[in-house]
Amino acid sequence: MTVYVEKVRALEIFDSRGNPTVEVHAYLSDGTVAKAEVPSGASTGEKEAVELRDGGNRLQGKGVTQAVTNVNGPINDALKGLSPYNQAEIDRTMIKLDGTLNKAKLGANAILGTSMAIARAAARSKDEPLYRYLGGCELEMPQTFHNVINGGKHADNGIDIQEFMITPVAKNSFRDGFEKIVNTYHALKAVIEEAGFETGLGDEGGFAPNLNSSEEALKMLRKAIIKAGYKPRKDIAIAFDAAASSFYNTEDGKYHFEGHIWNGEEMLQYYDKLLKEFPEIISCEDPFDENDWENFEKFTAKFGSTHQVVADDNVCTNPKLVRKAIKDKLCNSILIKLNQIGTITETLETIRLARKNNMTTMVSHRSGETGDTFIADFTVATNAGQLKSGAPARSERVEKYNRLLEIENQIGVENERLNHFPNNVDFD
């Protein structure tokens, strides 16, 4: 029996920040139904694919009814009758239908939701876990990064660096590493309370104490790691996402950072001091504005041999921009966000390109999340190696980690079979 896409239907739902987003249901001819929910970001790169919003007064202009209409109308009409097992054909059909360079006509939220829903339906139709359907064999669990102190656009406090993350370095399994993170997270709460600060949470489940500096946040992290019974860097390491575009002033070309107004060279000197003071930092993301490639390149030239330097806002999971980053030696790692580019196929192209050029990759959630666990399966399927999905708190974050625990258990039980399992999905 030939299985084909019977229809796709969308509706407007809400994400973890109370903003509207798109949910898509895919219906196959064999009776299979699957859904996907699309996340959205607070700190977004200018080169990201367009997230179609309605504008106007309703829901602060953030409604997505036009994106929903696009799924239910032209996207549905274009995909009816296609094989759900040929992901590349599904995605390229939508890209061609949209006809713009940034998916501005149909909306990346409409296109991605459909891309994900059909992939999940195809896996379900074959009675396979999504990670196995997408990845086939030789699957590995990822290193996870957890945003436990939120600043920047993710919190209302005095810290300009957006994310302070911890990652388990010494671990016997994903579960073992995650338990270390949970222990450190609870120790951090105690450290913050002992210092007299509130322990309210930011968008990504991390604490958002009203600290005065990034150094203060890093000292708290170090103290929490030790309090939890671990050794900084040896057991638990630290990473940060500066999201520097959020504190870069385009009018004067300076970085307005925690009471200072610095040029690129002064910002570089600050990072140099910070990394020397905190050797437990192993990964740095977006240390400069997305258009400040010159200083980004200088940062990588200076620290790239000892630290992971992750590019996000300046490449936006876009293969064309990643090629330029490779040529210019901008970074040594690429952040992967499916909704920045808008289809599974293009995201896979970016991962392959980075890996071919000896770059690491890190799959990422967004600050406006849903309970959808697609990225957990996707990270394992692609052997991306790294995932960041927020703190071990707030259900929309923890759902991803719980899914990884399930996957680890399944891989452990079925490892011998998985090593010989064919890849059933066509991405070419």
From Swiss-Prot:
<feature type="binding site">
    <location>
        <position position="366"/>
    </location>
    <ligand>
        <name>(2R)-2-phosphoglycerate</name>
    </ligand>
</feature>
<keyword id="KW-0964">Secreted</keyword>
<dbReference type="GO" id="GO:0043236">
    <property type="term" value="F:laminin binding"/>
</dbReference>
<keyword id="KW-0456">Lyase</keyword>
<dbReference type="Pfam" id="PF00113">
    <property type="entry name" value="Enolase_C"/>
</dbReference>
<keyword id="KW-0460">Magnesium</keyword>
<feature type="binding site">
    <location>
        <position position="367"/>
    </location>
    <ligand>
        <name>(2R)-2-phosphoglycerate</name>
    </ligand>
</feature>
<dbReference type="GO" id="GO:0000015">
    <property type="term" value="C:phosphopyruvate hydratase complex"/>
</dbReference>
<dbReference type="InterPro" id="IPR020810">
    <property type="entry name" value="Enolase_C"/>
</dbReference>
<keyword id="KW-0479">Metal-binding</keyword>
<dbReference type="InterPro" id="IPR000941">
    <property type="entry name" value="Enolase"/>
</dbReference>
<dbReference type="InterPro" id="IPR020809">
    <property type="entry name" value="Enolase_CS"/>
</dbReference>
<keyword id="KW-0963">Cytoplasm</keyword>
<dbReference type="GO" id="GO:0009986">
    <property type="term" value="C:cell surface"/>
</dbReference>
<feature type="binding site">
    <location>
        <position position="337"/>
    </location>
    <ligand>
        <name>(2R)-2-phosphoglycerate</name>
    </ligand>
</feature>
<feature type="binding site">
    <location>
        <position position="241"/>
    </location>
    <ligand>
        <name>Mg(2+)</name>
    </ligand>
</feature>
<dbReference type="GO" id="GO:0005576">
    <property type="term" value="C:extracellular region"/>
</dbReference>
<feature type="binding site">
    <location>
        <position position="162"/>
    </location>
    <ligand>
        <name>(2R)-2-phosphoglycerate</name>
    </ligand>
</feature>
<feature type="active site" description="Proton acceptor">
    <location>
        <position position="337"/>
    </location>
</feature>
<protein>
    <recommendedName>
        <fullName>Enolase 2</fullName>
        <ecNumber>4.2.1.11</ecNumber>
    </recommendedName>
</protein>
<dbReference type="InterPro" id="IPR036849">
    <property type="entry name" value="Enolase-like_C_sf"/>
</dbReference>
<feature type="binding site">
    <location>
        <position position="312"/>
    </location>
    <ligand>
        <name>Mg(2+)</name>
    </ligand>
</feature>
<dbReference type="InterPro" id="IPR020811">
    <property type="entry name" value="Enolase_N"/>
</dbReference>
<comment type="pathway">
    <text>Carbohydrate degradation; glycolysis; pyruvate from D-glyceraldehyde 3-phosphate: step 4/5.</text>
</comment>
<comment type="function">
    <text>Catalyzes the reversible conversion of 2-phosphoglycerate (2-PG) into phosphoenolpyruvate (PEP). It is essential for the degradation of carbohydrates via glycolysis.</text>
</comment>
<dbReference type="InterPro" id="IPR029017">
    <property type="entry name" value="Enolase-like_N"/>
</dbReference>
<comment type="similarity">
    <text>Belongs to the enolase family.</text>
</comment>
<feature type="active site" description="Proton donor">
    <location>
        <position position="204"/>
    </location>
</feature>
<dbReference type="GO" id="GO:0004634">
    <property type="term" value="F:phosphopyruvate hydratase activity"/>
</dbReference>
<feature type="binding site">
    <location>
        <position position="285"/>
    </location>
    <ligand>
        <name>Mg(2+)</name>
    </ligand>
</feature>
<dbReference type="GO" id="GO:0000287">
    <property type="term" value="F:magnesium ion binding"/>
</dbReference>
<dbReference type="Pfam" id="PF03952">
    <property type="entry name" value="Enolase_N"/>
</dbReference>
<feature type="binding site">
    <location>
        <position position="388"/>
    </location>
    <ligand>
        <name>(2R)-2-phosphoglycerate</name>
    </ligand>
</feature>
<keyword id="KW-0324">Glycolysis</keyword>
<dbReference type="GO" id="GO:0006096">
    <property type="term" value="P:glycolytic process"/>
</dbReference>
